[in-house]
Swiss-Prot record:
GO terms for cellular component: cytoplasm. InterPro entries: CRISPR-assoc_prot_TM1795, RAMP_III_fam. It holds the Pfam family RAMPs. It is found in: Cytoplasm. This is CRISPR system CMR subunit Cmr1. It comes from Saccharolobus solfataricus (strain ATCC 35092 / DSM 1617 / JCM 11322 / P2). Belongs to the CRISPR system Cmr1 family. The keyword Hydrolase does not apply.
Length: 467
């Protein structure tokens, strides 16, 4: 029998929830926030927290698949039904429904038909959508939409990451020799829709997350410990993570509006949530958050699981061809600042823009801290994530030398470009009782060397400069 275990009323700040295609919405589903995304992220943060506790208590790390096997009673697996089901109820007005109508394209088509092949560019200036043909002819486009572009355009234009992504939606080459008028119209309409849709970014999305527990399933030993550990990892995910794209750059950060507990199994987590405001007043938030991550209570749950079901776990080792992430006690929360949100939320948008513009080797903060370019690029490659490389030789030898010497274990240098890597240095916008904070923290990884005092100092100074 399925019963409601716990409910969270959550708020996401500037979530980019369109998925793989970089849109604000996805053609395959209408929901702005999906239970499957939440559950996938929850499972990932559960792996992070389990390895965090394991590294503190045993100095060991475990593979993600073996951690999933240990927690399959909670999250389910290919052959086992999940004991928990998530339900997401989005508040009215928080959806990303996009409408576009009455698009006037006749003048553009007439201009295009006079030529064989033309490149068409879109731009939005002075609240007017303009089509520019091969850099000469500029035609204003009349249209109707439910989207207030003026409300969000400054965030998109001033944010280096967003403005770069927008380039992929603003131009197309049309061969008018093989395209009749209706085909051209359809191509142009798709171009305009994709371009305008990129501006469909909500300042905030509020939703209720209901967690249901199926009590009819025959749970194996230590189920309560597993569930309580998993609920703790959900709390860490909410406090330090987010939904959608670019969460490491501050977008989509989650905050708790309120919480309800309907079963004794969630009593401890409910107590932590309720006490956060009073704890924040007694202690600095930079103390409260690590206390939650490195809680003695979850260490007890960890010990119970290790003592009884360690046979399910497989140790991660230096021969592995993948990385795992975890927190370390030496360096985790780097910097927390209160955000001034007095003027139309500009404080939050300014922070988001600054984070995106600074988190690269060409950012002013890193230039001020690390004068030598190759050393600076090595630092960025080690801590700020990277795209996938075709091979390691795409990296300059001098950068590799600094990576070997300071940041990355030599045996993993050949693997750091194998897949796209997460940024270890992450930023999160968190709201507590109508006060907004920007948090910078370090999520460590198995490919990184133990940080010396100089590297720690650079990380702290860099976070201080950015926020």
């Amino acid at each position: 029998m399925e019963e409601l275990l716990m409910s969270f009323k959550l708020k996401a700040i500037y979530p980019l929830t369109g998925g793989y295609n970089r849109h604000s919405i996805n053609e395959f589903y209408e929901e702005n926030v999906r239970p499957t995304e939440i559950k996938g992220l929850w499972r990932w943060w559960n792996r992070v927290l389990f390895n965090t506790v394991s590294y503190v208590k045993e100095g060991k790390l475990y593979t993600y698949d073996s951690i999933d096997r240990l927690f399959e009673d909670v999250f389910g697996s290919e052959n086992k039904k999940s004991a928990v089901r998530l339900e997401v109820i989005t508040d009215e007005g928080s959806d990303n429904h996009f409408e576009l109508s009455n698009v006037e394209l006749d003048n553009v088509i007439d201009c295009l038909k006079a030529n064989r092949e033309e490149k068409v560019n879109l731009d939005f200036r002075d609240n007017t959508l303009i089509i520019e043909i091969e850099g000469s002819t500029k035609i204003p486009i009349s249209f109707k939409s439910n989207l207030d572009i003026d409300k969000i355009k400054d965030l998109v234009y001033k944010n280096k990451l967003l403005s770069f992504e927008l380039l992929g939606f603003k131009s197309i080459k049309i061969d008018t020799k093989i395209s009749d008028k209706e085909v051209i119209k359809e191509i142009l309409r798709d171009l305009i829709t994709n371009y305008l849709e990129y501006f469909n970014i909500k300042q905030e999305v509020t939703f209720t997350l209901n967690i249901y527990l199926d009590k009819s399933l025959k749970h194996k030993q230590n189920f309560d410990a597993k569930l309580k550990f998993a609920l703790h990892s959900l709390l860490v995910f909410i406090l330090l993570g987010g939904i959608g794209r670019k969460t490491s750059r501050g977008f989509g950060g989650l905050s708790i509006v309120n919480a309800e507990c309907h079963d004794g199994l969630c009593g401890e987590i409910y107590g932590i949530v309720n006490n956060m405001e009073s704890e924040k007043e007694k202690k600095d938030l930079a103390t409260v958050l690590p206390n939650i991550i490195f809680s003695q209570t979850i260490e007890q749950y960890f010990s119970e699981l290790i003592n009884n079901e360690s046979y399910k776990l497989r140790s991660w080792n230096n021969n592995s061809d993948f990385f795992v992430y975890y927190f370390i006690k030496d360096i985790n929360i780097l910097r927390i600042n209160r955000i001034d949100t007095n003027v139309n939320r500009n404080g939050i948008e300014n922070i988001l823009n600054r984070i995106s513009n600074e988190l690269s080797a060409s950012g002013n903060c890193l230039k001020d801290l690390i004068m030598q370019e190759m050393r600076r690029r090595a630092f960025a490659l080690a801590f700020l994530g990277n795209r996938k490389f075709r091979n390691i030789h795409e990296i300059y030898p001098r950068i590799l030398e600094f990576l070997y010497a300071n940041y990355i274990k030599r045996e993993f240098v050949n693997l750091i470009g194998k897949e796209r890597r997460l940024s270890n240095l992450r930023f999160k916008i968190l709201e507590i009782n109508n006060t907004y904070y920007i948090i910078s923290y370090l999520l460590y990884s198995s490919y990184l060397k133990d940080p010396n005092s100089s590297i720690k100092d650079t990380l702290y100074q860099f976070a201080r400069c950015v926020i």
